Amino acid sequence: MAKGEGKVVAQNKKARHDYTIVDTLEAGMVLTGTEIKSVRAARINLKDGFAQVKNGEVWLSNVHIAPYEEGNIWNQEPERRRKLLLYKKQIQKLEQETKGTGMTLVPLKVYIKDGYAKLLLGLAKGKHDYDKRESIKRREQNRDIARVMKAVNQR
């Protein structure tokens, strides 16, 4: 988790189900005026989003930011590519880790911190179906144990 995280606007719960998150980092987002207004109104969808490193820059793709209702001519295309702001060393590290290793960059959540839109970006490795079933099984077992412990403690 990012330190001092502000108001969470959107989360990508599907990413934690489909991927094993290895590392996370906070990135700034380059947005236009109407886009930041839509983000503050929580009109953003991270479900199919991904990021990739191209020419020393990190770009966010397939993230839908709904057009601002009162934006008229200033509205941008809802699923356009958006640049992410990171330090050069972070970008080089991400490029190294994603190149040919089966790792990908997945947006985990968007939040407002000190007036700026921030994105929690996860370095992730895809899960197989049997891994997903295993994690669901483990979660249900933990839930059952907690339920039994609660019943024992209430007696």
Curated annotation (Swiss-Prot):
Keywords per UniProt: Cytoplasm, RNA-binding
Gene Ontology annotations of biological process type: trans-translation
InterPro entries: SmpB (IPR023620), SsrA-bd_prot (IPR000037), SsrA-bd_prot_CS (IPR020081)
Single GO MF annotation: RNA binding
Function: Required for rescue of stalled ribosomes mediated by trans-translation. Binds to transfer-messenger RNA (tmRNA), required for stable association of tmRNA with ribosomes. tmRNA and SmpB together mimic tRNA shape, replacing the anticodon stem-loop with SmpB. tmRNA is encoded by the ssrA gene; the 2 termini fold to resemble tRNA(Ala) and it encodes a 'tag peptide', a short internal open reading frame. During trans-translation Ala-aminoacylated tmRNA acts like a tRNA, entering the A-site of stalled ribosomes, displacing the stalled mRNA.
Family: Belongs to the SmpB family.
Protein name per its UniProtKB record: SsrA-binding protein
UniProt organism field: Streptococcus pneumoniae (strain 70585)
Lineage, opening ranks: Bacteria, Bacillati, Bacillota, Bacilli, Lactobacillales
